[in-house]
Amino acid sequence: MTLSPYLQEVAKRRTFAIISHPDAGKTTITEKVLLFGQAIQTAGTVKGRGSSQHAKSDWMEMEKQRGISITTSVMQFPYHDCLVNLLDTPGHEDFSEDTYRTLTAVDCCLMVIDAAKGVEDRTRKLMEVTRLRDTPILTFMNKLDRDIRDPMELLDEVENELKIGCAPITWPIGCGKLFKGVYHLYKDETYLYQTGKGHTIQEVRIVKGLNNPDLDAAVGEDLAQQLRDELELVQGASNEFDKDLFLAGEITPVFFGTALGNFGVDHMLDGLVEWAPAPMPRNTDTREVTATEEKFTGFVFKIQANMDPKHRDRVAFMRVVSGKYEKGMKLRQVRIGKDVVISDALTFMAGDRSHVEEAYPGDIIGLHNHGTIQIGDTFTQGEMMKFTGIPNFAPELFRRIRLKDPLKQKQLLKGLVQLSEEGAVQVFRPIANNDLIVGAVGVLQFDVVVARLKSEYNVEAIYESVNVATARWVESTDVKKFEEFKRKNEVQLALDGGDNLTYIAPTMVNLNLTQERYPDVVFRKTREH
């Protein structure tokens, strides 16, 4: 049975994001992945912060003139017979809710772990988000060219801390200065590492079979014997890879390598295109939509604002769920019930410019947005339904916003509500006073908000610390108990940008006590957009 051209395009797509703690090697791995996808010719071009981090690939220049930096947001490249979409999840200081929400637009994640450090804080948080949808996870243990922790220990830590089984696919031979390569458990092959080849794709020498004398000659008898001993242990103690369990998010295939030395990344990519799912079905408030449906549907998961005051433009990122996007097509923006013609969508196509006019399920397109599109918006060819599962997350950092000119309260509120619709920040209005509290998950969000209030709304504001530790959305089916709760806790209650009732806790202890005191009230960490 031959698939229709449309279904062939759907089957080729793989959409994933990389999750890691800052400095675990995400930027380097992104660069090496693009190198294998022939999106860039030589690595060493994704620079760190010092040079404003532009992954320079020629097709990314197109939006530069318009002053919107979408450079590293979405990268598409061919690999084997697939088309891979890699969504960037900002790390470091520009970490924000966008990072969380990007994970709702992918079908699979690659978790990168610094093998010298193991599971770190940011990785834990991002994994929690992937668990909301049981997203399949591949794992890459990075930095084998340095001294690392015991590989078995690393697997145990992932299993215990992140509650996901590990199925090693490759196993390291030595580490640091003694790093010799990896053995592939399912191909019964050893791939030998050469140093100094990080910027190019190298021809790797392969030794077939674990008991091959060539292996002892290549890595030394001691390391070869150590490998055989460790593998006996590994095969007895760890999970075998099972594709169904992987797709259910219950086990993660684990690869070892060094992104900097460009070794092992291709083994992981091979696994990704072979095992990761093609575009998955998505739930709406009325039915499930599958990628094979020919009518177009998509949802907005991120809005990127432009910090250049000369361009008021914002780009809404939409994940295509079903159907084919074609230039000039008419789509319905379900929330406002209006039909819009989309003629200038940005498509993120690597190299091949002739296909800029169309996009398929799994692809991400950018819509120009002049304040009319919100996060969570659904676009269809007329069907009235809304995609679910694009969450708001309870913020972890809070500040009070204060005006320099008290007469501008109205503009301030308008600005904050619009910025919260866009996902730049969350805003809370306490019921008991006139404060305005903003919440974020990354500290940079506050600076962005103050700068945008000034440039877009002509409001000069400053932020100051406030006694808030965390927030939870509250609801209850017991009206009487809920009224009592609201009456007794008025000082701690606020409305968010969408007028949803929120409990603002001064300390975690306070939150825990309040939750115990009111078992009939539900305290939620996430809320649907």
From Swiss-Prot:
Chain positions recorded as GTP binding sites: 20-27, 88-92, 142-145
Gene Ontology terms: cellular component: cytosol
Protein's GO biological process: regulation of translational termination
Domain tr-type G: 11-280
InterPro entries reported in the protein's UniProt record: EF-G-like_DII, EFG_III/V, G_TR_CS, P-loop_NTPase, PrfC, RF3_C, RF3_dom_3_sf, RF3_GTP-bd
GO molecular function, one term: GTPase activity
Pfam families, per the entry: EF-G_D2 (PF22042), GTP_EFTU (PF00009), RF3_C (PF16658)
Role according to the record: Increases the formation of ribosomal termination complexes and stimulates activities of RF-1 and RF-2. It binds guanine nucleotides and has strong preference for UGA stop codons. It may interact directly with the ribosome. The stimulation of RF-1 and RF-2 is significantly reduced by GTP and GDP, but not by GMP.
Stated name of the protein: Peptide chain release factor 3
Organism annotation: Klebsiella pneumoniae subsp. pneumoniae (strain ATCC 700721 / MGH 78578)
